[in-house]
Amino acid sequence: MSNAYEEYMRQMVIPMRQELVRSGFEELTTEEAVTEFIENTTGTTLVVVNSVCGCAAGLARPSAGQAVVRAEKQPDHLVTVFAGQDKDATAKMREYFGEIPPSSPSMALLKGKEVVHFIHRHEIEGATMDEIITNLEQAFEKNC
C-alpha cells in the first residue's frame, strides 16, 4: 500500500530519472530487469546509481551525461538504478559490484559482469564536473 510520502517521492524524482534517460540511459527499476540485463549483456556498461542528493543533481547526473557525449570511446550500454526509490533493483545491481561498499550516487563501468572502474560518492562530492567527466573518459579509453 502506498502512503502520501511514497507518492510524493515518486513524483519528486521524475525529473531526476528523466535527466539520465534523456542522456541515453535505460532505467532498470526491478530486480528482474537488472538480472535480465546483466545476465544477457556483453560488452561494456556504464551503470549510474542515481540518488536524490545534491551531489547527484549537481555533479553525478550531468557528468555522466556529458561524459558519454564527449568521450571518443564509449560504453556499449548505459543503465541506471535509483537508490532509495527502486530498492530491489539497486540491491540487485550492487550484488554485481562484489565487495565494493554501497555508495549513492556512484558510477560503475562493467566489462561483461566485472567492475573495471568505480566512482564512489566521496569521489563525486569532492570533485568538479570536469574532473568527473575526465575520470569517466579515461576509464572509457582504457576499457571500451
Curated annotation (Swiss-Prot):
Gene3D superfamilies: 6.10.250.2150, Glutaredoxin. One of its GO terms (biological process) is cell redox homeostasis. Pfam families: Disulph_isomer. It comes from the Bacteria. InterPro entries: BrxB/BrxA. NCBIfam families: YphP_YqiW (TIGR04191). Belongs to the bacilliredoxin family. This is Bacilliredoxin BCE_2233. It comes from Bacillus cereus (strain ATCC 10987 / NRS 248).
